[in-house]
C-alpha cells in the first residue's frame, strides 16, 4: 500500500480553520492528531432523530468528508455533478474510491447496491442488479460472495431478484 499524500484542505472549505486530509481519506488537525467525523442529520426523512449515513466534519463548517477529500486533491466539483463512492462504501473516502458523476448516474448506482431496512423487525430487504458489476474489476463469483457479506445475507445473492432474509 502506497504512503498517502497529506494536503491542507483549502481554508474556505472549512470555515477558515486548519484541517489536513490524506489520499487515504483520513483527516488531521493542525497538531497532527486524527480528527473524528460525525454523521449528518438526514434531510431526506421526516423523523428528526434519524441521521443519514454520510459522515461530515461538523466542527469544520459541516462539510461532507468525501467532498472535502475530493475537492482538496482534485479541485472544486463541476456544477451539477455529485461525488460517488465507487465501491458503495460511504466510509471509504480514499481518493481512488471517489469520482464525479451526474446526479442521475449516482441515483442509478445507489439503487443497485442498496440495503433497505424493512418495517418488519429483524428483516432486511436487498436489491441487487447484475449490470452494476461493470464498475468492479474482480471475478463475478468473488463479487457475489463479497456482496452477500455486505448485505447481511447468509448465502450468495439470487441476482436480479428482490428477496428477504432473517438476520
How would you describe each model-predicted region?
Residues 1-82, 89-164:
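Conserved recognition-core residues within compact binding domains
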Amino acid at each position: 500500500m502506497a504512503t498517502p499524500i497529506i494536503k491542507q484542505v483549502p481554508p474556505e472549505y472549512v470555515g477558515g480553520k486548519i484541517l489536513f486530509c490524506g489520499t487515504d481519506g483520513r483527516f488531521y488537525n493542525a497538531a497532527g492528531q486524527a480528527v473524528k467525523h460525525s454523521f449528518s442529520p438526514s434531510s431526506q426523512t421526516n423523523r428528526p432523530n434519524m441521521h443519514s449515513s454520510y459522515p461530515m466534519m461538523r466542527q469544520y463548517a459541516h462539510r461532507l468528508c468525501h467532498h472535502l477529500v475530493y475537492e482538496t486533491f482534485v479541485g472544486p466539483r463541476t456544477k451539477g455533478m455529485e461525488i460517488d463512492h465507487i465501491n458503495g462504501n460511504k466510509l471509504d473516502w480514499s481518493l481512488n474510491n471517489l469520482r464525479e458523476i451526474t446526479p442521475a448516474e449516482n441515483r442509478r448506482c445507489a439503487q443497485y447496491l442498496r440495503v433497505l431496512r424493512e418495517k418488519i423487525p429483524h428483516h432486511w430487504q436487498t436489491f441487487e442488479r447484475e449490470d452494476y458489476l461493470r464498475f468492479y474489476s474482480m471475478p463475478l463469483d468473488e463479487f457475489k460472495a463479497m456482496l452477500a457479506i455486505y448485505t447481511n445475507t447468509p448465502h450468495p445473492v439470487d441476482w436480479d431478484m428482490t428477496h428477504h432474509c432473517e438476520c
